[in-house]
Amino acid sequence: MLHIRPSTRKQAKIKLALQGCAGSGKTYSALLLAYGMTSDWSKIAVIDSENGSADLYAHLGTYNVVSLGGDYSPENYIEAITLCENAGMEVIIVDSISQCWDYLLDFHANLQGNSFANWAKVTPRQNAFVQKILQSAVHIICTMRTKQDYVLNEKNGKMVPEKVGLKAMQRDGMDYEFTVVLDIDLKHHVQALSLIHISEP
């Protein structure tokens, strides 16, 4: 049954993405952001697909960890998010969602038959995962790995190769699903790539 209600700020839950190459500090930054949102480590959960990297920052506080155990299917991610919601978490960090896309690409590559037609077996699974994130009644921070390359930059009169992050390793257009997308470089500088503007009254 449909009903109408006045808008309230407490109804708005942020869906934030942090992207960067390995070593840029995505997990650490996500934890600090999550604590800034809730001020309670016990209300933060990290869904870990990075082989235990979530535990590297246990000195920050006693947050919760859900290990995906090597199963990076969208269904396992959805189950993990539901588990965190039911446990009363206020901020869920999904670290990282790139493994889910890698899983789906591998799944697609191993299907028999027409490659284009086979996307019909992949897209609904990805869409279900995305909708789970967007429809969750809690704040969600997702990390995404970026493809890496090297560029030459001048440093002290010499040309030095520096590693840079390029495109996020996820489905094209995934960045448009989030309220905010932040790119973190290896010097830990942050740039907003996508931002839904919310005007102050």
State each model region's role:
Residues 55, 190-193:
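Short active-site-adjacent structural elements
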Residues 91-172:
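P-loop NTPase motor core
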Residues 184-189:
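Beta-strand-loop-alpha "switch" segments that mediate conformational coupling across diverse proteins
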Residues 194-201:
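Residue-level detector of conserved catalytic or cofactor/ligand-binding positions
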